[in-house]
Amino acid sequence: MSRVCQVTGKRPVTGNNRSHARNATKRRFLPNLQTHRFWVESEKRFVKLRLTAKGMRIIDKKGIDAVLVDIRARGENV
């Protein structure tokens, strides 16, 4: 399962660990992914999404139906 938010599209990015001596070693910054079930009233069923905390806030703002339209427009099965 890839570490990508289904709502925002956020994915891991790379950066550096920095020691006290300022030595740089590569590391990954992972998105804050959560798996969450949402009740979709129009479809009378639950939809399970893998999304970031920011994605949950977007759903709170726009509504699950509007977000599902965007996800399905990208060709994802939900």
Swiss-Prot record:
rRNA-binding found in the keyword field: no
Record keywords: Ribonucleoprotein, Ribosomal protein
GO CC terms of this entry: cytosolic large ribosomal subunit
Gene3D superfamilies: Ribosomal protein L28/L24
Chain segments carrying region Disordered: 1-20
InterPro entries the UniProt entry points to: Ribosomal_bL28, Ribosomal_bL28/bL31-like_sf, Ribosomal_bL28_bact-type, Ribosomal_bL28_sf
Any one GO molecular-function label of the UniProt entry: structural constituent of ribosome
Family of this protein: Belongs to the bacterial ribosomal protein bL28 family.
Protein name as annotated: Large ribosomal subunit protein bL28
Organism: Vibrio atlanticus (strain LGP32) (Vibrio splendidus (strain Mel32))
Gene behind the chain: rpmB
